[in-house]
């Protein structure tokens, strides 16, 4: 049996807005569609690796909020080890506002890392026992 892969990364809730054109500073435009979904480079890597058949241990911090609940349900549904995903009260889970111009495909993104920004080196010490069991560590 192969050993798991440990991934240190961020989860953000992606809020994607599609529009015919991007607004100018101070302007409001009507959008065509909106989608809420999971995001974050590390989280996306963890999900892709899991779907490819790897056992995954994901390391991050999320808020104890609705977006954090979405993350935990996603990881449970995907079969990702969440032992070292810490839920932090009073700090929100990260979010990204993604505006996509449907004509050109170009986008503009604002990312707020939220609780993941509270990760510190000591957190890796706390996860050391899990990391030691893994064949790879990605950050």
Each model region followed by its residue ranges:
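Glycine-rich phosphate/adenosyl-contacting loop at the front of the ribokinase-like
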Residues: 1-61, 68-70
């Amino acid at each position: 049996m192969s050993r798991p892969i440990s991934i240190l990364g961020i989860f953000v809730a992606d809020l994607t807005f599609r529009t015919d054109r991007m607004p100018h500073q101070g302007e409001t435009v009507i959008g065509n569609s909106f989608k809420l979904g999971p995001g974050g480079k590390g989280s996306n890597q963890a999900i892709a690796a899991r779907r490819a058949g790897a056992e995954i241990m994901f390391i991050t911090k999320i808020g104890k909020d609705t977006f954090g609940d979405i993350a935990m349900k996603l990881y449970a549904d995907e079969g990702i080890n969440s032992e070292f995903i810490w839920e932090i009260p009073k700090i929100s889970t990260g979010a990204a506002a993604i505006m996509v111009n449907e004509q050109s495909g170009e986008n503009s993104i604002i990312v707020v890392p939220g609780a993941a920004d509270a990760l510190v080196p000591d957190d890796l010490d706390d996860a050391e026992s899990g990391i030691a069991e893994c064949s790879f560590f990605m950050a």
